[in-house]
Design a protein with these regions (language model features):
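A mid-to-C-terminal "edge-of-domain" accessory segment
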Residues: 4-23, 27, 33-35, 277-415
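Alpha/beta enzyme core
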Residues: 5, 19, 27-29, 36-63, ...
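Divalent metal-dependent hydrolysis catalytic cores, especially in the metallo-beta-lactamase
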Residues: 60-68, 247-248
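Active-site-proximal loop/turn and secondary-structure-junction residues that shape catalytic pockets
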Residues: 67-73, 96-100, 118-122, 160-164, ...
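N-terminal active-site wall of soluble small-molecule enzyme domains
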Residues: 69-87, 92-105
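Short hydrophobic alpha-helical runs that function as membrane-insertion/retention elements
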Residues: 91, 115, 194, 247-250
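Catalytic alpha/beta core domains of metabolic enzymes, predominantly
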Residues: 198-321
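A compositional/biophysical signature of low hydrophobicity enriched in polar/charged and small residues
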Residues: 404-492
Length: 492
């Protein structure tokens, strides 16, 4: 059966104005951190299993893995990850080429589904597939889908790689060809079709139009997979979701080939917090998931990411002055509720005297505006000309000099955050260092652990807040017999 462009419907000439188009109860998020994400960085086997478990614990119900390609990867590398996911009720989708060899490899894992891809654009067909015709690549994909169907897979995703280029280059003429391809794939047994923006060419307006049109003519659910070459992957994926895509692809921190794809947090938080779209994830678990992933992989959360320490930090004095009264004035209330709890404040030349007043009044019992201003000016002076912000000890001293009150560092950390430190450990020679490494990487505040040689055996990079659950107190509590010496160096 062929689908003519006339069958697509006149309504496709206009953008859909409905903010959420014909949604099922829950939008399905497919996390590809352990497939697409491993194009950015390969993880050790034990890390992959731990990350898989955390993905499941956050509520993700569909996770994508790559079929093994010996000798670079092996069956034994992938099996423990599949088991960790399936034991937690996660649907495992194995990604491979549209060929019988890869389908046979996928069968061995007893995965729930398979994702089969082939390039369809003229550029890719000519230079990657050696000049084969569009009809031939679709027939190859249909053949692979039929093999997957006969193998008993319940989920079969057919990926028309680089399909956005057809839409961009061929416009109206390209859409009927995509419609034809989807119809052939449906008849072959595909359960969902992915229309990826393989080279990150689309903008949100174009992504919205592409998926509005495709959703109208597609007899199969659509998956959205956008690359981030212009920094628009998450925005494009959101637009596709609002126009009817039933599966959206993302990774933690958006990692993937080149500069990645949509970011799981940015995608889920925006859809849930702003558009009211349910994704099935535990929204409030995402910050912990990201911090854990950063610790065990060594991939830092960038400063401009919505879950970074910087995203939580209010810098402008007038902003600080309002935020101490109504914190949602500058940080979205759903982010405070689910991610941060409370804002942090930067000590800079712009520090607010109202912030200082909020900190000291519970301890002084009175409001002395002149002293408050002098404290604020002293803090501002310390950071003038780009100097490093003062330590919490220095802040304590500045306040004490004006008020005679010593405010606990733990209390100051509530406003200014903990301090970034290097913790140098000297261990007893017989103690198994990996035991400490493995446990410390699970602790909140730890950024990384390195074994070293010299005066110390191990260096822990961390943020400490001086409470009972700080990294230093946990080390002394849990490993008293392992430590010969412990030193803390505060950094900026």
């Amino acid at each position: 059966m062929c689908v003519s462009f006339g069958d697509l419907g006149a309504e496709n000439k206009h953008f859909n104005t409905n903010p959420v188009r014909s949604f099922r109860l829950v939008l399905r998020v497919l996390d590809s951190t352990l497939r697409e994400g491993e194009l950015f960085r390969l993880y050790p086997s034990d890390v992959r299993v731990r990350v898989a478990s955390r993905l499941a614990d956050s509520g993700l119900k569909r996770v994508e893995l790559t079929v093994d390609y010996p000798p670079r990867t092996s069956f034994g590398d992938v099996v423990p990850v599949v088991k960790a996911l399936r034991d937690r009720g996660v649907e495992v989708v194995m990604h491979g080429r549209a060929c019988e060899e890869d389908i046979e490899a996928i069968r061995r894992y007893k995965a729930d589904g398979c994702a089969l891809y082939i390039a369809v654009s003229k550029l890719h067909r000519e230079y990657k597939l050696h000049g084969v015709s569009e009809d031939e690549v679709i027939e190859r994909l249909c053949t692979a889908v039929r093999v997957a169907r006969d193998s008993g897979f319940g989920y079969i995703r057919a990926t028309l790689e680089d399909s956005s280029r057809i839409y961009l280059e061929d416009g109206e003429e390209g859409l009927p060809r995509i419609a034809n391809s989807i119809q052939r794939l449906k008849e072959s047994g595909a359960t969902i079709v992915s229309l990826p923006d393989t080279s990150g060419l689309l903008t949100p307006r174009l992504a919205r139009d592409f998926f509005a049109r495709a959703s109208a003519f597609s007899p199969l659910p659509l998956a959205a997979h956008f690359h981030n070459d212009y920094g628009l992957a998450t925005a494009n994926t959101i637009e596709a979701a609002l126009e009817g895509a039933e599966e959206v692809h993302a990774t933690l921190l958006g990692i993937g080939d080149r500069n990645g794809i949509a970011d799981t947090y940015e995608l889920v938080a925006t859809l849930e917090d702003i558009h009211g779209v349910r994704t099935g994830l535990n929204r409030s678990s995402l910050r912990e998931l990201y911090e854990y992933f950063s610790r065990v992989t060594g991939i830092e959360i960038p400063w401009r990411h919505p879950l970074s320490r910087e995203a939580r930090t209010v810098r402008a004095g007038v902003h600080q002055s309002m935020t101490v009264k109504r914190k949602e004035g500058y940080i979205p209330s759903r982010k405070l509720e689910n991610d941060f709890g409370e804002p942090l404040y930067a000590i800079s030349p712009y520090v607010s005297h109202n912030l200082v007043q909020t900190i000291i009044t519970p301890h002084t019992g009175t409001i002395d505006k002149e002293k408050t201003r002098r404290i604020a000016e002293s803090l501002a002076t310390v950071t003038r000309d780009g100097a490093t912000p003062p330590s919490l000890d220095a802040v304590q001293e500045i306040i004490r000099n004006e008020t005679g009150v010593m405010i606990p560092r733990q209390e100051l950390a509530r406003y200014f955050g903990g301090e970034r430190v290097y913790i140098l450990l000297k261990l007893h020679p017989q103690f198994p260092a990996q035991r400490l490494v493995k446990e410390a990487m699970e602790w909140e505040g730890v950024e990384g652990v390195d074994e070293v040689y010299g005066e110390a055996d191990m260096v822990i990079r961390a943020h400490i807040t001086y409470g009972k659950g700080s990294v230093v107190s946990l080390l002394r509590q849990k490993f008293p017999d392992a430590l010969q010496d412990l030193k803390v160096l505060v950094t900026d």
